[in-house]
Regions:
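Short, mixed-charge aromatic SLiMs
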Residues: 74-80, 175-179, 283-297
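Active-site histidine-anchored catalytic micro-motif
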Residues: 30-43, 47-79, 118-216, 222
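Conformational coupling and interaction surfaces
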Residues: 31-34, 51-59, 63, 195-198, ...
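Short, well-ordered secondary-structure micro-motifs
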Residues: 106-108, 180-183, 227-229
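Bacterial N-terminal signal peptides that target proteins for export
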Residues: 1-9
Length: 326
C-alpha cells in the first residue's frame, strides 16, 4: 500500500468514525465493578472469534475471568489463545480446554497456535472451570458463547443447579427470519440451521430449556462485513492487538470477514447496538431456531431475548473506535 493510499484510507475512516455521537466507543460508563464474563469460543477456524476477543479485551466494562475452548481440537485452540494473550500483554487470563473431538473443520490458524513458546503446559477442563467460577461468583457471571454449545450442554448435564446461577448467557447463534447471505438488501434468504446451533443441537436444546436469562444474536443481526477500507485502517494501527489480528487474518486466508461473533460483546457493553425482543424459540432436530408465538389466547412464555436487526455503521463505529485505539 502506498503512503498516499494509507493516508486517504485514514481520512475516510476517521470521517466515518466521527459521524456519530457514539463514535468515541464509550457509549456506556465504565462501572465501578466491571461485569464478570467468561468467553466460550471455537477460535481458530473462522476469524470472527478473534475479532470478538479483541473487542472484549478493549472493553473496560468487562472483567474476563476466563476463556474456554470448544468444538474439535480444543487443545490447539487453547494454545492459540495462550499466544494471543501473551503477545498483547494479558497472559494472566485463564484458558481452559473443552473435551477434544475429531475435527470437522480445518483449523486455519494452526500455524499461529503452534508458533513461539507461549503455550502453557496444561489447560484445566473447560466444564469444570466454568462450574467452579459460577460457584465462586453466583449470579455475577455472564457467559458469552460464540461457538458450538458443547461445553454448555456438558455443564448443564453435570450440574444444572449451578449452571442456573449464571447471571445471563449471550450467544451468537440461530437464524430466525434471515439466513446466510441475507444482509437486509437483495434477494431474501430464508432461515437456515446456523453453524453454532447445528453442530450440537442437543446442547442448544438444553440451553434454551435451562431457565437461565438468555440473549440471542442470530444471523439476522450479525452478518457484518469488515470491508477493505475498514480492514486497512484497523490493520495499520500497529498495536500488539491489531498486529495479532492482522497475522490471524492472513492465516485465515480469505478476503472479507463477516464479524458474526463480536456483536455478542458489543451488545453486552452497549445494548442499543442490537435491541432485543422476547421470544419463545424452539430448536428442532434439524437445527432450525423456530419462533413459537403460541395461540392468541394462550401465548407461550418467552425463553430468550432475541435481536432481529442491527445497524452495521453504528456497530463498526463502536468497534473500530475501541479496537483501533492504542
Amino acid at each position: 500500500m502506498s503512503k498516499s493510499t494509507a493516508v486517504l484510507i485514514s481520512i475516510v475512516v476517521c470521517a466515518f468514525l466521527i459521524a456519530s455521537p457514539t463514535s468515541n466507543g464509550q457509549s456506556s460508563p465504565t462501572p465501578a465493578f466491571p461485569e464478570k464474563v467468561i468467553l466460550d469460543t471455537d477460535i481458530g477456524d473462522d476469524i470472527d472469534d478473534a475479532f470478538a476477543l479483541a473487542l472484549a479485551l478493549r472493553s473496560p466494562e468487562l472483567q474476563i475471568i476466563g476463556i474456554t475452548t470448544t468444538f474439535g481440537d480444543t487443545e490447539t485452540r487453547a494454545k492459540l489463545l495462550d499466544r494471543f494473550l501473551a503477545e498483547i500483554g494479558r497472559p494472566e487470563i485463564p484458558v481452559a480446554a473443552g473435551a477434544p473431538a475429531p475435527p470437522k473443520t480445518t483449523l486455519t490458524q494452526r500455524r499461529y497456535a503452534e508458533g513461539g513458546h507461549f503455550a502453557k503446559p496444561v489447560h484445566p477442563d473447560a466444564v469444570a472451570f466454568l462450574l467452579e467460577q459460577i460457584r465462586r461468583y453466583p449470579g455475577q457471571i455472564t457467559l458469552m458463547a460464540i461457538g458450538p454449545l458443547v461445553n454448555i450442554g456438558a455443564a448443564i448435564d453435570k450440574d444444572p443447579a449451578t449452571f442456573r446461577k449464571l447471571k445471563r448467557v449471550i450467544i451468537m447463534g440461530g437464524s430466525i427470519k434471515r439466513g446466510y447471505g441475507d444482509f437486509g438488501f437483495g434477494p431474501p434468504m430464508p432461515p437456515q440451521p446456523e453453524w453454532n446451533i447445528l453442530n450440537d443441537i442437543p446442547s442448544a436444546q438444553k440451553l434454551f430449556a435451562a431457565g437461565v436469562p438468555l440473549f440471542v444474536m442470530p444471523l439476522d443481526a450479525t452478518q457484518l462485513k469488515l470491508d477493505e477500507v475498514k480492514r486497512a485502517f484497523l490493520f495499520s494501527q500497529g498495536t500488539p492487538l491489531t498486529d495479532a489480528l492482522t497475522l490471524l487474518y492472513h492465516q485465515w486466508g480469505q478476503e472479507t470477514p463477516t464479524l458474526f461473533d463480536p456483536m455478542t460483546i458489543a451488545f453486552l457493553v452497549n445494548p442499543s447496538l442490537c435491541p432485543v425482543q422476547p421470544m419463545h424459540i424452539r430448536i428442532d432436530d434439524k437445527g432450525f431456531t423456530r419462533p413459537e408465538p403460541g395461540p392468541p389466547d394462550t401465548p407461550i412464555a418467552p425463553n430468550a431475548q432475541v435481536c432481529l436487526d442491527s445497524n452495521p455503521d453504528s456497530f463498526f463505529r463502536f468497534y473500530l473506535n475501541r479496537v483501533a485505539t492504542p
